[in-house]
């Protein structure tokens, strides 16, 4: 590439939803009510996402089911 040119397209090895939301994936979720949760994916289906939620120290705090309609954004740790 010459100066000023950009490489177009997605990065090689970009993840797929099935992989990043697979059981055991670490994610951070922003809910529409203003809560941000971090945890490990237990399961997901057409209704929502089940997380094993962790506090800022990484300690488990319980399980949370989040309906898709309540989720604003899901951030995934680099895979």
Give residue spans per PLM region:
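Short beta-strand-centered aromatic/proline hotspots
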Residues: 36-43
